[in-house]
Amino acid sequence: MQAVEFSKGDYTALLIPGMGANLIRLTNTRLGAEILRAPADDEVETFKGRPHVFGLPILFPPNRIEDGRYTFGGRTYRFPITNAKEHHYHHGILKSQPFAVSKAWETGEEVLVECRYYSNAGNDAIFRDFPHEFKCKITDRKSVV
């Protein structure tokens, strides 16, 4: 898994673009304090299967969708059941999709990393369940403040 580590001031961050651009670690290096729940070395497989329980995942659409389907604007959307016990789709179509780092730069006071994901008819992983072309862009920034 490709990881992007970046630091500014007292903070170091670790971003995994290939798993939903999840910022899985944020550490205050001066205090030695972990800010986010990051996967331990023995939890890598858990992270791959359940990325929404670590870091700052993108959870679009959020929450749970009962029976894996809903209707909006006269159109019914169907998602795979991801929680069999409660029979619903759970937390988002982007959480494990491969984002690409589109830009990384530093200003005097900030370090920024921008990741993008494009969904279109050629991307069966999402388009099958959510047949809309869209672009998701997320920028993580760490500043001195």
Q: Where on the chain are the PLM-derived regions?
A:
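Conserved small/polar residues in nucleotide/adenosyl-binding loops
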Residues: 144-145
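Surface-exposed acidic/polar loop and edge beta-strand patches at domain peripheries
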Residues: 1-139
